[in-house]
């Protein structure tokens, strides 16, 4: 039963971490001319008006993008400034934060004429919303399971590949399914850059994902976590957000650390960021 709809959480602190990482990775990949196939395994709607009933119900963007937006003129980090400038281009009225773009929007923004984009979405309502979005001709929406679709897609025709895997993890089995899909993808496309988002919840199921990746034989696995509050202070709900990057671009860790040093003070006194290599070369 598919129940997760990201509109309830659009623009939250996890989106900030996920999309800032995605933006930094794509920015690096675009330095080379060779074509890229981008894949988003769980695309969602693509664009989220913040005034909708769903988003207003929880208003999680108030602990995410909103404080960054309000302070954007004072933020000096180059990566963060470029990201917020790009975010401004998603607004119908410049300098007024009314919409938050999901990963399909960020990926579509990186597309060049010779690149490709595959957007998978299994939730029928979310896919219907996604189908209504205006996207470049190189973007193809696929109504189906993103992890299965990813395995069927590889190997790709382009020299390079960049994948975002961000399930809702409504089922515990998804943590291991992600490990399996990622390992299969890297067997077919060895130098693919893969980004995997995961939630930090009191049940700590994300440890299944991290230990599975560590035991998989995959090399060059880096991960970072953005915590809104300490784990012990959350008896329920997400207290933090994690991103795994496999085959990360050179300098990504330093870039994100510098950006996050300006992000965390805006998210509250308990907010902090940490990162390390899970598996080296």
What would you call each of these model-derived segments?
Residues 1-281:
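Class I S-adenosyl-L-methionine-dependent methyltransferase catalytic core
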């Amino acid at each position: 039963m598919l129940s997760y709809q990201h509109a309830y959480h659009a623009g939250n602190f996890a989106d900030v971490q996920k999309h800032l990482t995605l933006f930094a990775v794509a920015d690096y990949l675009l330095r080379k001319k060779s074509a890229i196939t981008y894949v988003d395994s769980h695309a969602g709607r693509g664009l989220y008006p913040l005034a909708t009933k769903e988003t207003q119900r929880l208003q999680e963007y108030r602990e995410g993008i909103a404080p960054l937006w309000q302070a954007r003129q004072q933020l000096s980090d180059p990566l963060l400034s470029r990201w917020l400038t790009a975010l401004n281009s998603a607004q119908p009225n410049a300098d007024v934060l009314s919409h938050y773009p999901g990963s399909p929007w960020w990926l579509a923004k990186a597309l060049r004429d010779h690149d490709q984009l595959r957007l998978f979405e299994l939730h029928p309502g979310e896919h219907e919303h996604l189908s209504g979005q205006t996207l470049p001709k190189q973007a193809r929406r696929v109504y189906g399971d993103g992890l299965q679709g990813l395995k069927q897609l590889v190997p790709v025709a382009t020299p390079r590949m960049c994948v975002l895997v961000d399930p809702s993890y409504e089922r515990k089995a998804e943590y291991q399914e992600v490990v399996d899909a990622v390992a299969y993808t890297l067997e077919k496309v060895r130098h693919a850059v893969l980004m995997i988002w995961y939630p930090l919840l009191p049940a700590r199921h994300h440890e299944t994902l991290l230990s599975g990746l560590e035991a998989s034989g995959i090399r060059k696995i880096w991960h970072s976590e953005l915590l809104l509050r300490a784990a012990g202070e959350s008896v329920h709900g997400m207290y933090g957000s994690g991103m795994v990057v496999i085959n990360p671009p050179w300098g990504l860790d330093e870039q994100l650390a510098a950006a996050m040093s300006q992000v965390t003070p805006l998210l509250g006194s308990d907010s902090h960021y940490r990162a390390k290599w899970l598996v080296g070369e």
